[in-house]
Structure formats: C-alpha cells, structure tokens
Amino acid sequence: MEKQEILREFSSDPEKYYTVRLFREEGFERRACSVCGRYFWALDGRPACPEDSDDTYSFIGDPPAPRAYDYAQAWRTIEEYFVKNGHESVPRYPVVCRWRDDLYFTIASIVDFQRVMGSSVVFEFPANPLVVPQTCLRFKDLENVGVTGRHFSSFCMIGQHAVPGNGGYWKDECIDLDYGLLVRQLGIPKEEVVFVEDVWAGGGSFGPSLEYYVRGLELGNAVFTEFQGELGNHTTLDRRIIDMGAGLERFAWITTGTPTAYDCCFGPVMGRLAESLGADQDSAELAAYYTRVAVNLGRCGDLNEARRRSAQEAGISDSRMAGAIAPLGEAYMVADHIRTLIFAISDGALPSNVGGGYNLRMMLRRVAGAMERTFPGLDLDELVDLHIDYLMGTYPELDGARQDVKTILDIEASRYGDSKERMGKITAKITDRGRAPGVDELVTLYESDGITPEYLIEAGAIQEVPPEFYSRLDELHAPPPKAAGPGPELAGLADTEMLFYGEDPPEFEARVMHSSDGGVVLDRTSFYARGGGQEPDHGTIGGFRVTDVSKHGGIILHRLDGGSLAEGSTVRCIRDEKRRAGITRNHTSTHILNASARGVLGSWVWQHSAFKEEDHARLDITHHSPLSAAEVKKIEAAANGIVKEDRGVSIGYHPRGEAEQKYGFRIYQGGVVPVSTVRIVTIKGYDDEACGGTHVKSTGEVGLIRITRTKRIQDGVVRLEFVSGDAAIEHERTAAARAEGDRAAEEAKGRLQEERDAGRLKSREIIPGMLEEITGGGSAEGMEVATGPGGRRCLAAGIHDEYFHTSFGKKLVAMDPACAYCAIFEAGPTVRVLAYAGSKSGAGADEIVREVSAVLGGSGGGAAGFAQGGGKDSSKMAEAVARARVLLFGGDNT
C-alpha cells in the first residue's frame, strides 16, 4: 500500500479526513501548493506550502514568539500546558527498546506504548490522554548532524497520545490543543501557523495526519491512526489512536531564532565548545549560512552540494568555511553525539561492533577524532558533566549513571587511540594510490578497521563524506528479521494445558491429541518446553522416552524415542525429577549471577543470552572487556552471598504495563515477552525479572554457585560458564583433587630436582678422578674401556644420568682427542644414547648414535663430534649395548 495512493484518496475528500473544527472556526483556507501541489491549510492566503514559501527558515534571527525558550525551558512550558489540559505527564521510556525485538532503539514516542503480540502490534497506554518527553535515537542521517542546523542523532519527541473515550479525544480536540500550544502558550501569531495534509501507514494500520509548520519549520505531526487493511477494502479500527509527535528541539529553535537548533538545545555545552574555538554563535554570517543550508538541503537533496551552494549564496569563502564554519560544525556534532551516548549508555547500551552498539561506536570515534583535531584542550568528562547537569531537571535519572557513562567513554576513547597507528598505515596506502575509495570501500574500511570517513578527510584520502555512507551502515546493522513460525501440521489443535505453571505434578495422565513422526501433543503436560534458554524436561510418556519438548504458540510438542502413541488414548507420563531439579537450580542461579555481575561491574550489564542444562549453564552478559580473576571472584562471592542468605523466590503475574511501571524495564533481561500478562520472578530485595522458566522456592536451595570459565565471545559480550548445586559441589571436589594432584606432582618434581642436584654434585666430585684414571691408561668403575690402533674407546651403560655423561664425555675427548665415548642410560620412559668422538679418534658419533637408537626403536642425529638420540623400547637395552660394543670395540654382537 503506497503512501501517495492513500494521500490522493484522502485529499480527494478533505471534509471527511482533514477538516477539523479549528479550521472552520478560525477561517483556515485549504490550498494546493503552487510549486509541489500538496494541500495545506493557512490563514494568510499564501500560494505555496511551508517548504516552498519565501519565508522558509526566516525565523533565524527573527523569531515569531515573544519569549525565547531553551531546550529545558521549552519542555517545562509544554508539559505545563498539556497537564493543565487534562494530560498525565509520563517519564520517558529507555532509548534502548527492550520491549521490541525488531528495534534496537526507541525511534518515536508511540513506540513506548507498542507491544508486539504474534504478528500484531497492540497499544498499551499508562494514561489517557498523556504527554511524554521521549528521547529518540535515529542514525540514518549522521552525516547531516552538525551541518544542517536541524539534524540530531538523538532528539526529544514530545508525544501527545490519546484514545477516544474514557477521557481521551479525537481530531478536533487534538488540533485545538496543538494550535493552542503554539498560539496561546508560546504566543506565536496565528497567521504564522500552517497545517499540511499527509498520511501515515505502518504495521497494517494507516490514517490521515496534519503536519504543522511555522515559517517553514515542521514542529509536529498529528497522526490519526484510524484504519486497518488495504485501501479500498479497509475497516475502521476498534481503537483509534492519536499519535502526535513534535520536536522539542524545534520548539526551542522557533522561539529563540538562533542560527541552528544546536545553539539553543545544548545549554552550557555549546558555550564551552564555542569558547574553545573563539567562535561567535550569534553572528549574521552564521545565520545567513544556516538559513540557506536548511533550504538548499530540502531542495537539492545532496548535503555536500547544499553546503557549497549555501556558502556561495552567503558570500563565505572556502578558507572561511574551512577555518570557521567547519570547526563550529564539529562542535555541534560533538555536543550532539555526546548527548546521544549519555542517553544510550545510561539506559544500558554499549558501543561495540555488533547490533545497535555499532552506531554508538561510530559516533564515539567521530567525537574522538573531532576532539583531537579541533578541541585538544577539552576534557570529555567535562562535557559529559555539563550535559548531565543541564539535562537533570528534565531527566533526573541521568545523574545516577554519570560515572558509568564516563567509564565507558574513557575505555572506548582509549581503544580508539590504541588503533590509530594501524589506521594511519592503512590510510597512507590509500592516499599513495591516488584513487579515492567509493562508498562500498569506505564501509569495509570502517567495518574491518574502524576507520571513519572523517579520519580519511583529515588525512587527505577523501574530500567529503558520501551522503549515503551512514544510512548504508545503519541498514547493515538493522535487527534481523523474525524467524518463521511452526508449520501447518499443528494447525487447529487446542492449546496445551501447561501444568508446570500450576501444581506441576511429576507424574500425571494425559490424553493424546496428536501423534505423528514429528511428535506427540497432549491435552495437558508437566514437561517444560525449551524456551528462554532453559532446556526441556525429559522422562517417559506411555513408556517411551521423551527426548525433546518444544513450544509452538500455545501448543507443546513432545518428541519420543522409538515409538508412537494412538491419538485419543490416555497415557501415563513421568518426568525425570533429577534433571528438572538441576535445570531449575541453574535457572535461578542465572538470575542471581546476572544481578551480581551488574552490581560488581556496572549498570551496563544486561543478560545477552543464557543456557541452562541439568549439570551446567552459561550466562552471556553485556560488558566492555574480558573479566579479570578478581572480578570473577567478586561476582561469585556476591552470588553465593545471596544463596547463603536463603532469600525467598516468588512468582507473580501482572498486567504488562503495570509490571513495567512497577519494576522498570530491567525485567526484560531474557528478551521480549509477547504476552499481555507478565510472569515476574522475584528474588526478594535483589532482582525482578520477567521469566517463564522454573525456579526454586528460596535461594538456599541452589546450594552453591561456581563460575568455571569466562571468555569474551564477541565485542561487548562476556560469557560466564557455571555450575550450581550438586554439580558445583562435584566441581569443587574435582578441583580439590586436581589441586592435590598438582601439589603431589610439584612435590615429586621437587624431589626429582633434589635427586638431580645431588647427582650433579656427586658427578662434579667423581668426574675428575675418573678422567685421570682413564686418560692415564686405567679403567673406571662401571665403564668398559679398551685401547686399540684408533685410540681409546669407552662405553658406559646403565649408570649415571645425562648431566654426568654430557659433562664427562665432553671433557674426555677434550683431554684425549683420540678417544671416543658412548653412554646408554634410562631417562624416564625412554632410553637415551649419547656419543662423543675426538678429532683424532677416527670414529663418528652420529653413526654410533643412529645405529644404537635404531635398535631401541628410535632415531638420533648430530655431527661426527657429538650426537644424541634414543628410543622407547627399553626391553632392547641389552641389544643396544651389544651393538655399541661392536661399533666401539669391533667384533660381533655377542
């Protein structure tokens, strides 16, 4: 269903879709834009829509409001207005969208209240009507941030939401309120307000919308979500929704008339950055340039071309652009990106190379580069403090995350600094080749090497950032599509009664509702199905072994080993209680460890994934670095402290909205919960999580938790492998036995070393006398010595150690070059062979060793003067000695 098709249909009947009470009462006239043809409503008889009018962005330097409001002041006055008009002011939701698995970040205020149920999106509002200052993150236009004067990576969407009836309202009241906000609350002349007809469509629903502008600046868009289905065959929704989203930054901008929206929205941060540059934020030159950039970007669509045109029209030279405008643009970008990072990290996101963390790391690297280039004297922590101090009045929760934000930014900045040398070498090669990289190569350079386009611009490798670069990156790291649901073989079956959420009997009888090669469906079951990282129960059904249990919507499918059951029959079912107990302990241990890790490491720790089996489990957490031994010890100690305190573990059921309001979004550790009633597992005074798994009644039942291994499995994710209960006790027993074995081995090693040292000492004492005896024509105890025509020959077999033989042999041939020496002795599981041959002996040490080692089933090598080898067949020791005699003394092997 194309948006333009819907717009044509709706615009053909404005009375039905767009005409509201205000237009009739105030005399708004409907016109078609003389330039683009869009329909709009205005009081001043203008011929063109706001985006094509001559007064577009003329508020810069000449605001239409009698009073200026900065970011914080603008929210206070808007909140006051809506509360006075019957709305409940709701605190912002996290920017990390924990309640939707198809979004990493909150991109609009209406997302706060959307919950996915199967293939449908439902709305759950905590009040009707309400207003919310929702911080939203969007990354498709990062290259525009700091450049256009109006693009942000994070912005506050003022969400005005209502449902007709029960205190809510519909189109007439909505537009009355929005018009009243502009004209009566902010004092903007009514002739300045223009409404433009538009439509919205998404998630199978659609409806008309009215965008409202003042001097070409779109301030808000009131969407009336009214229909579902396909145009022409659509029906009216049972529950119509008012979804008005307005930009808080733009409200501040329209009332202050500053050259950019950044100047009035970042409080003291912009003042500090501008002071560092020595820049004048209120200069006529800036106002002229940014007025034109905003207009030209809308008309030509290319950022780089819009900048060139705007500089030319404002009379700004290239040198002035490079020396004044560009550095100020970097200041705007730095202020914006740091604010975004503060919100994201405060809400539990981490910069990384995967998923939503990718954009955060990209922004941080842009900030790091700009700080180094343009603001070398400024401290990042100072800017964080200035931001949080300014925002605390609107978002008090940021103050509690101040140190965590600084910690993460410091770690990431340090990593960026460490990688600069490598980045410099890669960039130099690109520069030397004389050909600028295209968009695909730029994406690869950032993906593989962390090199940002801004870094390449600074190095002279490229001239400008391609307009599509950041949107391409954003697309590459969008959330993956949902997996397909189960096949049609289970269609039409009634949901299985899940006994494991009630009395949970270990033995029960059930009726077979479906039986096939794919498995068995019962009318009721106590077998827990695989889900949430918990492995399934095993046992028997009708005497057949249960090997797997899976959940398909509300249907539980059991897989059996070696048999089938008749549909309609009643069967006896027995669950493996030992397996269930082990898995249950590990599941509660997962909750304990997750909360303990967060307490030890920092607020950014969330469960990334988990796996719970009978005798082992693992927990993957979001963390920036590998864990040290000290950190592991602290986490384990904290977890076992909770176990020893024997805290109660309780389970309660709550409407999803109430659970979120009561416990916060920390409950979504295991991911999205696609049900309207949430099962909350509470470890008293320690942890609350939405969870469908099995748990012990108190933490003392876990017994013991031992972390067996940790490793970093991907950027920003650390795995903790652990055991609990009997498995932990067995692990301790095994570890103790291993430690005892290691201790015994060390003692044996020490004794062996002592023996070696004693042997060496003895060798030092006896070698001189033995050498004197042999070189004097005598013999030595335990050695065979003979003198022939070629010189003296010595054979030592089965005596002394390697130290003795190497020392003795080397000295012997040095004293008597006509001598040859061979030693054969046991060393552990092998038999060693050493040979020395003096320069005048006529013997070859290598030949002796090679042949003797072969007898032992081994090999050897070396030179004529010295060689060594051996073999493992100690039973051939006598044969080896006999072969050595032949080689040394002649004769045969007898």
From Swiss-Prot:
Q: What is the lineage of its organism?
A: Archaea, Nitrososphaerota, Candidatus Cenarchaeales, Candidatus Cenarchaeaceae, Candidatus Cenarchaeum
Task: Provide the protein name.
Answer: Alanine--tRNA ligase
The UniProt entry, under HAMAP family, shows: Ala_tRNA_synth_A
Catalytic activity, reaction form: tRNA(Ala) + L-alanine + ATP = L-alanyl-tRNA(Ala) + AMP + diphosphate
Q: What EC class is this?
A: ligase
Cite a single GO BP annotation.
alanyl-tRNA aminoacylation
Q: Which family does it belong to?
A: Belongs to the class-II aminoacyl-tRNA synthetase family.
* Positions of the UniProt region annotated as Disordered: 739-758
Report the protein's function. Catalyzes the attachment of alanine to tRNA(Ala) in a two-step reaction: alanine is first activated by ATP to form Ala-AMP and then transferred to the acceptor end of tRNA(Ala). Also edits incorrectly charged Ser-tRNA(Ala) and Gly-tRNA(Ala) via its editing domain.
Any single GO molecular-function term of the entry would be:
ATP binding
Cofactor, how bound (note): Binds 1 zinc ion per subunit.
